[in-house]
Structures are given as C-alpha cells and as structure tokens.
Amino acid sequence: MAHPYLFRLDERVARGLSHWDPTSRERHHQFLLSQQNPDGGFGGRGIPVEYANEEPEGRDSDLYYTAFGIRGLAALKLFTSQDARRVAPFLEGTRHYHATVIDVVSWLYSALMVQAATGIDLLAQASADWPQELAARLEGFRSSDGGYSKTHEGAIGSTYHSFLVALCYELIGQRLPEPDKLVSFIRSRQRDDGGFVEISPMKRSGTNPTAAAIGVMTLHSAVGPNLRDDVLGYLADVRSDEGGFQANSRIPFADSLSTFTGYLTCLDLNEKAITDPKRLEEFILSLQHPTGGFRAATWDQSTDVEYTFYGLGTLGLLWSESK
C-alpha cells in the first residue's frame, strides 16, 4: 500500500521544521502540551490568549482538535510515546462516536499515530474486516450527486468532506467506490474564476475548497494542464498583500488556514513562484504568540491547536522547499 498522503504531508512539514531553532520549537511544544485536557484529548479555542497556557477549564476534548494537537506535536517530531499514552484513553472512549466524516477521519488518524508511537492498537478488539466495515460506514455519507456529505443526513455533497473521505479510504487501504462519480462531482464544483466552491449553490470560489478539490483530483490522478492553470490563476487572485492567502477574493486579509492550504496546493501543483517566500515567512511568524501557539490572522486574539498546526505547517512546507 502506498504511504498515505496525510503521513507524507506530516513528514514534509517535520522535515522543514527541523531547521528551526530549538527555543522556538520548544515554545510551541509547550503550548501544545498545555492544551491537552486531563482526559487525554485536546479542546478548541475559548481561552483568551493571555491565559492560553493555564488550565483549560471549560474546554471539552474533541476528536477534531485532538487530531490537530497530535499533528502539531508530530510536526515538531515531539509526539512521544508518553504523549500518545495520555491520548489513548480518550480515543478508546470515543471509538464509537462517529457522527460526522470529521469524527471518523480524526479518530482514525489519531489512533494510527498512537499505534505508531506506542504499539497500542486501539482496533485490536475490532473484527478482522474492520476496514471493510468502516468503508461501508463511509458510504453512508455519500450523496446522490457523487460526493460525500458532512453527516448521514446530508442531501448534497461537500467538497471538503469528500476530500476527507478520500483520505480516509487511503488510510484504511480500501478503494473508494465509483471514483469517476467523485471526480465528476468535484469538477461540477469548479467556477469561472478557476477555483472551487464548497457546496453547489455557491458562486464564489474559496481557497480551502479549492485546495480540497485539488487534493481529491490529485489522489485520483485527474489534474490536467488546464485545471492546473485555472487553479493557479485563482490562487494568484487570492494572494494577500500581507504575504499569505485570503479565504476568497472578497476577504481583505490573509489567514493561516487559507495560507497553509493555498501554499500546499501551489506546491502540489509544482508552482512556487506565486508567493514570495520571505513575505510568506514574515506573515506566518507575525501570528506567533510570545508564549507559544499561533493565531488565525493578524486581527485574532486567541490561539488554539488547529491554527498552531497551520502556522507550523506553513513554515514546515516553506522551509522544506528552501532549506
């Protein structure tokens, strides 16, 4: 089985961040550890930045943020066996809580990372055909348009959640059923500006659904020269004067999520010239909090594990290319 995309991406980021000075790495390491709850999971934002390193009261653990906490630690090559053992009980307690596509992918990624770090197999008690059972569960999210919805009740496909399902199939080593229908669904989400939208009624493309669309198309070897040129043209339009990428052409500021996904898409399309590496680096570094963690944008006042990963991820990709 080919090495899954998510793990290849983690390795690219970690390779770049290995060039960073130890003091900066440790500052963000300590921030990430401070966001872990007593039950072993990680929670989202809700703490003012000045209290970010204090006890995270009132912030429940969540599979989505737990996966980002693990990804951040892995990016720094600091997801230790001790860290993994602290996470394992939370994952064991949430193994059947898979109401959304995000829950499924977040749990599976986290469980595989725990197994790699400790040897603890959270699927040891599952039946031998659990990959096929999980694949059947994933098909419960499939919509009539060929894509995948956020929940089982969803009526129309989501570009982002379709990408997550494609990643999940790769993680479990199963073939996604009727891939041509998924590719056609993704193509239907492209708009005249060259980018892609999240759901069908939308007219204006977004950086993040465009990145998700290219992710799906890349996994299925469906990126041709015309599509590449269209998407690169769109990404050039959403470059910000700050050095990063905007969420869409009407949002007047860059954010770290859009910058991470936009820059990753440029790299995956073998195009580095759209961004100025120095300005990109300066923008992301400006989002650091002095005590660790990254904010979403220059206006933001809070840090969390998700946006910390986007900050680390962008720097890791940038430095893996330049150093």
Which ranges hold each PLM region?
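An alpha-helical repeat/solenoid feature that recognizes helix-turn-helix modules
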Residues: 2-24, 47-81, 97-125, 129, ...
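Long, well-ordered core segments of solenoidal/helical folds
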Residues: 23-41, 81-99, 128-147, 176-195, ...
